[in-house]
Amino acid sequence: MFRSRVSGVFQQVRFQSTAASKAASKAQGLGAKVQGITNCAVYWAKVTGELGKQIYLKEGFAPPSLSQFQSVYQNLFNSVKSYALKPQKVIDCAESITKTDALRYTAYGVQILGLFTLGEVIGRRNVIGYKVPSADKH
């Protein structure tokens, strides 16, 4: 009887250690995979950054100058001001939109809404709504 109890205890210990070693080996394998993916992502991010620098220098890209900013915003301000002073221009523009233009602008709107929604889901880390603690705990 003593012998069966002792062997049962040793068998349980052996099974527990086997389960622990299996879990440890799986965790090590997962860690190696994550490290490999991370190293790959860092490498390609560096390559992309260096390529971007070379393109920036070769193409002669530069941020817009102050005069360019001023001209763009001045034109935008004048357009908004003219539409505010003459509302009939807005109606004429709306009437001149064709079916293909309406479809194109609708597609753009859906894309923008989709990207906004994706950003919201990423920010919340939840697809539907925010996680709110229940009122039962109060």
UniProtKB/Swiss-Prot annotation:
Signal peptide: none annotated. Keywords: ATP synthesis, CF(0), Hydrogen ion transport, Ion transport, Membrane, Mitochondrion, Mitochondrion inner membrane, Transport. Its main location: mitochondrion. One of its GO terms (molecular function) is proton-transporting ATP synthase activity, rotational mechanism. The keyword Ion transport applies. GO terms for cellular component: mitochondrial inner membrane; proton-transporting ATP synthase complex. GO terms for biological process: cristae formation; protein-containing complex assembly; proton motive force-driven ATP synthesis. It is found in: Mitochondrion inner membrane. Belongs to the ATPase g subunit family. F-type ATP synthases have 2 components, the catalytic core F(1) and the membrane-embedded component F(0), linked together by a central stalk and a peripheral stalk. The central stalk, also called rotor shaft, is often seen as part of F(1). The peripheral stalk is seen as part of F(0). F(0) contains the membrane channel next to the rotor. F-type ATP synthases form dimers but each monomer functions independently in ATP generation. Mitochondrial membrane ATP synthase (F(1)F(0) ATP synthase or Complex V) produces ATP from ADP in the presence of a proton gradient across the membrane which is generated by electron transport complexes of the respiratory chain. F-type ATP synthases consist of two structural domains, F(1) - containing the extramembraneous catalytic core, and F(0) - containing the membrane proton channel, linked together by a central stalk and a peripheral stalk. This is ATP synthase subunit g, mitochondrial. It comes from Yarrowia lipolytica (strain CLIB 122 / E 150) (Yeast). The gene is ATP20.
